[in-house]
């Protein structure tokens, strides 16, 4: 559907069954925030920050542009609300506030994110928390998506399509995911979408049906609809192939 790159893989083992320019690093819009989000979610999983903890939003966090949770400097908000905004819409201010709360500073979280990228085999330079200048490949995004789907902190909110958070001053921020597959594809449990004028429409998608889970990445689709269409087609291809393999195994058992 006119994408610049794509990959489809079994989520458990990461074995790719379809790929197009999957190793080529390119602009991926807001998906450059995924390494920071992974570090934050895993930090919460490891107890560095309790979801019930109160977090004071710094001036630096409140200044972050792009998708945001409309946080104000010095606002006090629970970590769970920040996590919801971070996971659902990749809210940069929420990710930044969580990073500072869990790791003590944005720099420390950035270093952790870089270390996780290395562990995942992603050779990208990640020198700034939002990853503004980081280019990632479809394979890189697949590795990040697989890791995020193993994080309980992430999956607590990754299936939500529409929700919201409440601020202490009485304001409410609506959170609407751009991942249409959460509504249209049975078993979709995440992962994230992002876009920009130069990157096009990008996304990482995880779908589980029966005993199979597939993850796919689409980079550079011309619009949101074609991103969803490409992802749906890839996912459907994966499940069709899985059913053929399962049937072949059954036939083999019967023959034996």
Model-derived features with residue positions:
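Penicillin-recognizing serine hydrolase domain
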Residues: 1-5, 105-255
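Active-site-adjacent loops and short helices of periplasmic peptidoglycan-processing enzymes
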Residues: 1-139, 143, 149-152
């Amino acid at each position: 559907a006119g994408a610049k790159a794509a990959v489809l893989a079994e989520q458990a083992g990461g074995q790719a069954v379809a790929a197009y320019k999957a190793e080529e690093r390119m602009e991926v819009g807001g998906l450059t925030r995924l390494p920071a989000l992974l570090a934050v979610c895993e930090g919460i999983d490891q107890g560095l920050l309790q979801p019930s903890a109160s977090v004071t939003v710094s001036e630096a966090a409140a200044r972050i542009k792009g998708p945001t949770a409309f946080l104000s400097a010095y606002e006090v908000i629970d970590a769970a609300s920040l996590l919801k905004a971070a996971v659902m819409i990749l809210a940069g201010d929420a990710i930044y506030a969580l990073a500072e709360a869990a790791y003590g500073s944005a720099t420390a979280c950035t270093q952790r994110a870089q270390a996780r990228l290395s562990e995942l085999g992603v050779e990208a330079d990640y020198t700034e928390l939002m990853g503004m200048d980081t280019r990632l490949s479809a394979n890189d995004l697949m590795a990040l998506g697989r890791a995020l789907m193993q994080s309980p902190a992430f999956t607590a909110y990754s299936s939500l399509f529409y929700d919201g958070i409440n601020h202490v001053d009485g304001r409410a921020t609506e959170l609407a995911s751009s991942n249409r597959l959460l509504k249209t594809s049975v078993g979709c449990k995440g992962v994230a979408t992002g876009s920009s004028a130069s990157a096009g429409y990008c996304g990482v998608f995880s779908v589980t049906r029966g005993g199979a889970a597939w993850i796919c990445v689409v980079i550079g689709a011309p619009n949101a609809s074609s991103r969803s269409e490409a992802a749906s087609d890839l996912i459907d291809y994966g499940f069709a192939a899985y059913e053929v393999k399962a049937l072949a195994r059954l036939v083999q058992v019967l023959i034996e």
